[in-house]
Structures are given as C-alpha cells and as structure tokens.
Swiss-Prot record:
InterPro entries: DUF480, WH-like_DNA-bd_sf, WH_DNA-bd_sf
Protein name (Swiss-Prot/TrEMBL): UPF0502 protein VPA1223
Family designation: Belongs to the UPF0502 family.
Pfam family, one: DUF480
Superkingdom classification of source: Bacteria
Organism (species): Vibrio parahaemolyticus serotype O3:K6 (strain RIMD 2210633)
Alphabetical list of PANTHER family matching this protein: UPF0502 PROTEIN YCEH
SUPFAM superfamilies per UniProt: Winged helix' DNA-binding domain
HAMAP family membership: UPF0502
C-alpha cells in the first residue's frame, strides 16, 4: 500500500469522507468547517485541538500528493476542499460503500471491533449484521495489492478482536493489543451514545456552515 498519512492527514481525510456522505449539501468543506470537523469531541479518537494553520499545512501536503483538491469557485474568498483519497477516475484505490465507511471510521477512531464499527458507520454504510462487517474487514485485510487493515490479537476476556487501518504505516500489534478498551457490552453502548451526539453535532455544523456561506 503506497499511501501513508500522518495522524493529522488521516484526520483530515477521514473528516472529508465523513462529511461528503453525511452532509453533502455542505461539501466540499471550507478550512473553518474542516477544522471544526477535525476537532469534534464526538466520534473522534483521539480528540484533537488543531489550529486552522495545522489543518491547512496538512491540506497543502495532501494537495501536493493529489489526495485532496481545492474546489473553490472562481474569485471565491473561501477555499473549499474535497478528498481524492479513493474512487477517483485515475486513482488506484477503489472502495465499495461498505469498505469506504469502515476506512473512514478507522481514520477517525483508530482500532475498533466489528461491533463498534457496525454501530459507528450507520450513517456511512449499511451492514445487516456484525458478520457482514467481519467479511468486509477480512477482504480489506487480504487485498492483493497489499492489506489496508490488520486484525489485532484478541485480548484476554474480550469477545471480539479489534482491527486497525494501515494508512499511517505498519501497526505495532503488540503495543496496540496492550491498550485495553472498554468491555464489549459497555463499549457498544458508549458507541451508540457517541453516535447520537455525533448526529446532533452534524446538524449544528451544518447550520454553522450555512451561516458561514451566507457571510462569505
């Protein structure tokens, strides 16, 4: 796999993919909207406190690598950005809706179990059950051109193994396995509550973007 991102670049790409699906009327995103999305307290792990300068540096680096494009209208005072991370006409990375939803969720949240992924991707893709999530994860982990995700060793007492994307380089499996997440049942409930908060945040961000567009 050729694409390797920094943590901030991964956050930026994840946010652009997320907003493309969940708030298409507000996409592409302005720098302000992208910074707000990157710093969301819901549906983000870890929570970041990035400045617009931090985000712009990441965006500029991604534009140079043709992973993001500036879609600003002629003479517009506000730049608008969209991702070119996957499913572009000449790009190598082609993802299904389910694969794209999973990768987006991992770029925003890091390592997660199939159950957590199913709950957290409910606005990005449709999965009928956890087994369907597991099947897509296994496909992503065995891509012919190189794995896109890796399955982490299952921790003692846990029902599910976590999976992690490989877009930020190789994963230290032993270190990741040592990180102890919440128990299976509580983590799923927490994920559901986080998703509800995320949806409210989406509505608020959409309103902010509308106000911003009126003022620009």
């Amino acid at each position: 796999m050729k694409v390797e991102l920094t943590a901030i670049e991964a956050r930026v790409i994840g946010c652009l993919i997320e907003k493309e699906v969940t708030t298409p009327d507000q996409y592409p995103l302005s720098l302000n909207a992208l910074t707000n999305a990157s710093n969301q307290k819901s549906n983000r792990e870890p929570v970041m406190a990035l400045s617009e300068s931090d985000v712009l540096d990441a965006v500029d680096a991604l534009i140079e690598r043709r992973l993001v494009s500036d879609e600003s209208a002629f003479n517009s005072r506000v730049s608008k950005y969209q991702h070119r991370f996957c499913n572009t006409e000449f790009g190598d990375l082609k993802l299904s809706e389910q694969e794209k939803g999973i990768i987006c969720c991992m770029l925003l949240r890091g390592a997660q179990t199939p159950g957590e992924i199913r709950t957290r991707t409910n606005r990005l893709a449709t999965f009928h059950d956890v087994k369907e999530v597991e099947a897509v994860l296994e496909h992503l982990a065995s891509e012919e051109k190189g794995p896109l995700v890796v399955k982490l060793p299952r921790e003692a007492g846990k029902r599910e193994s976590r999976y992690m994307h490989l877009f930020c380089g190789e994963v230290d499996v032993s270190a990741m396995a040592a990180a102890v997440p919440a128990t299976s049942s509580s983590s799923v409930r927490i994920a559901q509550l986080e998703q509800e908060v995320a949806e409210l945040r989406e509505e608020l961000d959409a309103l902010k973007a509308q106000v911003e567009s009126l003022l620009s």
